[in-house]
Amino acid sequence: MDKSLFEQARPILEQIQDNGFEAYYVGGSVRDYVMGRNIHDIDITTSATPDEIESIFSHTIPVGKEHGTINVVFNDENYEVTTFRAEEDYVDHRRPSGVTFVRDLYEDLQRRDFTMNAIAMDTAYKLYDYFDGQQDINNRIIRTVGIAEERFQEDALRMIRCLRFQSQLSFDIATETFEAMRIQMADIKFLSIERIVIELTKLMRGINVEKSFNHLKSLKAFNYMPYFEHLDMNQINVTEAIDLELLIAIVSVKFDINYSLKPLKLSNRQVKDINQYIQIMNALPSIITKEQLKMFVYDYDTHLIKNVMVAADVIKANDIQGHEPLIVNLQTIDETLHRLPMHNRKDMMVNGGVLMAHLNAKSGPWLKDVLRQIEIAIVTGKVSNEETEILKWVDNHVKI
């Protein structure tokens, strides 16, 4: 089992301990270590206060000092070091009104979300598991620490995180935990959509996404999310992992809607990908010739095309017409891409200025149309991408 990331962080824990404080690895890294999974981010919990951590280390960043978190920069890596804390009453089902720093590990671990995430580990790899997290991991169960209703009242996002973990880890959800989610799911309406989108993005890529997505539907979670709240998501089927952006595109195509994506507060890149996914799915069924395939591969992002094709079963499960596999498949996509004479308009050996000069014409709507005609002619092999040949072709085929 790879312990390298823990060993890289070990000097931080040892330095804290040398100054008379406790320090432990905690959270997802310990959970993944227990499960034998790859370790990613290392989080550290300590009895030292933020001020004490800043006095111990020369290079720190007070990223969340008021909540007890200091980033310690060590060997060009950032490590989150958080003081043992007890949280006061939560407001709006999403954040504590305040935190109290404590000196007791148990008190810190009991505030955490799920038993599998409430295990601490010292530098000797001894585990501190007060809530039977290892047993739940062995039984592949997600269970809240303490009373489920209280954990979800504190932070409603934990319900979406629970489903995300179920998707990623292929665990079951403890009965009392699931029943609390059924009762309290409406509280996710108090959350920022940005936090929900982060969890949904991870959930949709999980190995057990079908079960988790069905739980999202049965728990009526979509009823309390912007954008999705206006749709009958019970009609949407997800049978395997796909990008969240592709899910949104499938929803749009299936329901033939053009709702604004602004309520989801996505990045410009995400919105662009969603729009391309929609265009790709709408274009695929009509591709029956090699010329159409060439223009299709030229016009759209190949990575997104492949994502749609790999998700063919999901698309079919939502009664959306797919592609003709003899014409469009992963092999023909790659071969067509490799053989394209150019990959975007910047590669074209003429531009608007050259055309206007050659035709002695002023700019106007005609210019965009002619440039597109030239693109099609080059990509489909009707003319070579050379200025003289293109201008000859324009003289013979274009009227303005």
Swiss-Prot record:
It holds the Pfam family PolyA_pol_RNAbd. One of its GO terms (biological process) is tRNA 3'-terminal CCA addition. Keywords: ATP-binding, Magnesium, Metal-binding, Nucleotide-binding, Nucleotidyltransferase, RNA repair, RNA-binding, Transferase, tRNA processing. It catalyses: a tRNA precursor + 2 CTP + ATP = a tRNA with a 3' CCA end + 3 diphosphate; a tRNA with a 3' CCA end + 2 CTP + ATP = a tRNA with a 3' CCACCA end + 3 diphosphate. ATP binds at G28, R31, R112, D155, R158, R161, R164. It is an enzyme of class 2 (transferase). CTP binds at G28, R31, R112, D155, R158, R161, R164. This is CCA-adding enzyme. It comes from Staphylococcus aureus (strain MSSA476). The gene is cca.
